Amino acid sequence: MAKKDEHLRKPEWLKIKLNTNENYTGLKKLMRENNLHTVCEEAKCPNIHECWAVRRTATFMILGSVCTRACRFCAVKTGLPTELDLQEPERVADSVALMNLKHAVITAVARDDQKDGGAGIFAETVRAIRRKSPFTTIEVLPSDMGGNYDNLKTLMDTRPDILNHNIETVRRLTPRVRARATYDRSLEFLRRAKEMQPDIPTKSSIMIGLGETKEEIIEVMDDLLANNVDIMAIGQYLQPTKKHLKVQKYYHPDEFAELKEIAMQKGFSHCEAGPLVRSSYHADEQVNEASKKRQAQA
């Protein structure tokens, strides 16, 4: 555990092999030409080279590139956002079709400045992808939309293949890590989503290494399961800049393997756990696992 003002040395298992082949450069060019944003770039995701260069997948970030919140773990720009871009859904859908994606992940900055929290644009993006790529599965990753469940219903009525909303950290650390969100609101958001569309898998993720205990991580598992969450992801918190929260601990891959085993024993349909795991990491595999489990239970 890190002491005050002490920076931990990044361990060997977190060193990433950079791959910038033609898939990577082509995808980056496509994003710029269509004036699109990805959370891969904006949040400095450590898996960007694997996903773009090897798997040729990306997580689109809609509603602009400026977030109305300032969570202390997140590298996305914060401030006063620009007006909503009503053409954004079509551009995202065109890119999904051009890339011939099997699975598309759509996330967004928080838009607390908008009455609908951006739900209308979010929903139209899903519908546009359905029209142009009917065989592409779609995962949506919204903010808590300020706890407005009419806005959540707008999104759930489009019937995405997975609803993903991240609880991010343990209950005790939530006020320090994401001051404008609450632990219980995130749980209720996930529960309401499942109530609205019981057959659609729900998913949530946490970052560890912020000073939580193993018991608190297991408490998160229990809380998510109590609110009918199907899929969980657990990854290592990495400090994006010196202005963000410091890493308190780097977990060994064996510790992640143990947490995954506990999560699966507790009843999640799928758990992705590892030092470089992020919310949408191997998302295409997760939707397949959830679908198989639903079919087996039918």
Curated annotation (Swiss-Prot):
Enzyme Commission (EC) number: 2.8.1.8
Record carries keyword Iron: yes
HAMAP family hit by this protein: Lipoyl_synth (MF_00206)
Cofactor binding description: Binds 2 [4Fe-4S] clusters per subunit. One cluster is coordinated with 3 cysteines and an exchangeable S-adenosyl-L-methionine.
This protein's name: Lipoyl synthase
Cofactor(s) required for function per UniProt: [4Fe-4S] cluster
MF-aspect GO terms: 4 iron, 4 sulfur cluster binding; lipoate synthase activity; metal ion binding
Pathway(s) the chain acts in: Protein modification; protein lipoylation via endogenous pathway; protein N(6)-(lipoyl)lysine from octanoyl-[acyl-carrier-protein]
GO BP terms: lipoate biosynthetic process; protein lipoylation
The entry's keywords: 4Fe-4S, Cytoplasm, Iron, Iron-sulfur, Metal-binding, S-adenosyl-L-methionine, Transferase
Positions of the Radical SAM core domain: 53-269
Family annotation (InterPro entries): Aldolase_TIM (IPR013785), Elp3/MiaA/NifB-like_rSAM (IPR006638), LIAS_N (IPR031691), Lipoyl_synth (IPR003698), rSAM (IPR007197)
UniProt binding sites for [4Fe-4S] cluster 2: C67, C71, C74
Pfam families assigned: LIAS_N, Radical_SAM
Binding positions for [4Fe-4S] cluster 1 per the UniProt entry: C40, C45, C51, S280
First-tier enzyme category under EC: transferase
Reactions it catalyzes: [[Fe-S] cluster scaffold protein carrying a second [4Fe-4S](2+) cluster] + N(6)-octanoyl-L-lysyl-[protein] + 2 oxidized [2Fe-2S]-[ferredoxin] + 2 S-adenosyl-L-methionine + 4 H(+) = [[Fe-S] cluster scaffold protein] + N(6)-[(R)-dihydrolipoyl]-L-lysyl-[protein] + 4 Fe(3+) + 2 hydrogen sulfide + 2 5'-deoxyadenosine + 2 L-methionine + 2 reduced [2Fe-2S]-[ferredoxin]
UniProt family annotation: Belongs to the radical SAM superfamily. Lipoyl synthase family.
Disruption phenotype: Disruption of this gene interrupts lipoate-dependent reactions, which strongly inhibits growth in minimal medium, impairing the generation of branched-chain fatty acids and leading to accumulation of copious amounts of straight-chain saturated fatty acids in B.subtilis membranes.
Subcellular location per the Swiss-Prot or TrEMBL entry: Cytoplasm
Highest taxon above the source species: Bacteria
GO cellular component: cytoplasm
